[in-house]
């Protein structure tokens, strides 16, 4: 475990930014009112594949899934695996619920709120994958403690991933990329960076769909970077 200063996302205990945007369409509100209660992560208790799905399965955890394209793609690709997606933004949750309905994804559970609240309730060594795709970069230096890639969260990721489990990160912000590489370098006793050549972090690996945000980033001339780390142990 790496010593970390108070003030990173594991100790701030608050979310920054909006939790909702434009008013939901009626069809979206219907999904929030009717489908979300059926598939949301309970507010209390241990969170496991068994507690959520009734049987043990490889468990995936996505932090800040945006509109849910990646979450839905992976869940559809791996129907015998279990997926938890966390997103505080109501409009993103509503869009993701549409993917769950349209793709008929019984292997997805959703948490509208702070991902770390749920992550703490998952037993150590229970996760096969953690995804953090295009997190808020918090570009100002004084806001660096708000970045999800910080020593506290990375220690938490390490405790929840099983040996051989994988942490996947995507960002189009060069500052966030360099910051993440620096933080992860402090955790080489917990994680192995899987890149062997520069191409390995310039293109997504197999089974990794480009989201709308990623496509927008490319159109606007920004290059997404893809990092994969394996849990050592």
Residue ranges and their predicted role:
Residues 149-163:
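A short glycine-rich, Lys/Arg-flanked "PGG" loop and its adjoining helix->strand segment in the class I
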């Amino acid at each position: 475990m790496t010593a970390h200063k108070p003030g990173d996302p594991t100790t701030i205990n608050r979310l920054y930014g909006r939790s909702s945007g434009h008013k939901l369409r009626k069809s979206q509100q219907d999904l929030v009112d009717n489908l979300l209660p059926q598939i949301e992560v309970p507010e209390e208790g241990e969170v496991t594949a068994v507690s959520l799905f009734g049987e043990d399965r490889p468990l995936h955890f996505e932090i800040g899934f945006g509109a849910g394209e990646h979450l839905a793609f992976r869940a559809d690709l791996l129907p015998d695996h279990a997926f938890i997606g966390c997103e505080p933004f109501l409009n993103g949750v509503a869009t993701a619920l549409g993917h769950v309905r349209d793709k008929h994804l019984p292997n997805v559970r959703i948490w509208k709120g702070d991902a770390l609240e749920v992550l703490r309730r998952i037993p150590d060594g229970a996760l096969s994958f953690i995804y953090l795709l295009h997190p808020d970069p918090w570009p100002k230096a004084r806001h660096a403690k708000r970045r999800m890639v910080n020593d506290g969260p990375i220690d938490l990721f390490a405790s929840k991933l099983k040996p051989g489990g994988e942490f996947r990160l995507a960002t189009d912000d060069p500052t966030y990329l360099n910051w993440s590489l620096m933080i992860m370098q402090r955790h080489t006793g917990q994680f192995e960076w899987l890149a062997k050549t520069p191409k390995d972090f310039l293109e997504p690996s197999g089974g990794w769909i480009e989201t709308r945000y990623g496509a927008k980033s490319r159109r606007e001339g920004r290059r997404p970077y893809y990092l994969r780390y394996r849990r050592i142990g």
